[in-house]
Structure formats: C-alpha cells, structure tokens
Amino acid sequence: MILPLLLSASSLSVPFVSQHKDTCGAAALAMVLRYWSEDVTQEDVARALVRPELHGIAGSQLAEFARSRGLEAVAYRGDMAQLRDFVGKGRPLIVAWHLGGTRYHDVAVIGFDDERRAVLVNDPAAGPSRAVKAATFEKRWAGAGYWTLLVTRKGPP
C-alpha cells in the first residue's frame, strides 16, 4: 500500500526521475547518480545497459555503470538496519522489489518515517517521496532476495 505523498518527510534530497517503459533501474540509478552530482540521464543509462530480453537492466549492470563513472558501487543482500544506517549517513540506496510473477521493480530508498512505520522511496513509476508501509516494503524486497545497491563517492564521506 502506498500512502499519500509526504510534504515534510525526513528524507534525503534525491532528485526524482520518472521512468520510461522498462527503465526503472536506469531511472533509479540516474536519481542516485544525480544525488552525487553526476550529470547523467536515465537515457544515458538505458542506452548503455537495457536488455530487451529482461525487459530492463540486470542489477549487476547498474553497479558496473556507476563504477564506470568513477563511483563506488556494491550490490549485496541488505537488511533494514543497513538501509537505515546508510540513509542516516546521507547515502541513498537502490533496492529491487518483486511485484509478482516475473515482474521486478527498482526504487531509490531516500528516508524513513518512523511515526507512520514507512520507508520513503523515490519510485520511478509512482512518484517522488512515496511513503510505503514498512511491511509492504519488506515483503516486496524479500521477494527480490533483498537485492540492494549502494553507490557512493570514493573516499571518506
């Protein structure tokens, strides 16, 4: 369940990018790269990485693209405590959701709303700063094996 847009949420200022067809990964990565002041569009990412047979982009390719831009990128099996820690340190993440059947979707995690028990995401399909109930977020994320991508600048924060 997606809750109404939050106007005063505790979240990172991650620029929002609305996705084109089958480009949620490209849009999510473009958001995070723009957060790190990289001049990149989802079209740049998609041109380099979209695989029509996957109806999108493989997660490993997102990490490779970020590294090709000089950033550090690590894909791993995450947990909620790690998400909170990284976001609390000013580092947005990309996670994959399983939406049912063979449908997967990438979103950028930008904050948390403890009062509403929600995770704040920039969802390239649904809009910026969306509050998703933590239980719904966790179920979708678990379905995708808790796949998480951390992209940061090299060196100390």
Model-derived segments and their meaning:
Residues 67, 72-123:
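Active-site-adjacent substructure of cysteine-protease-like catalytic cores
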Residues 1-55, 80, 99-101, 115, ...:
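Active-site-adjacent structural segments surrounding the nucleophilic cysteine of cysteine proteases
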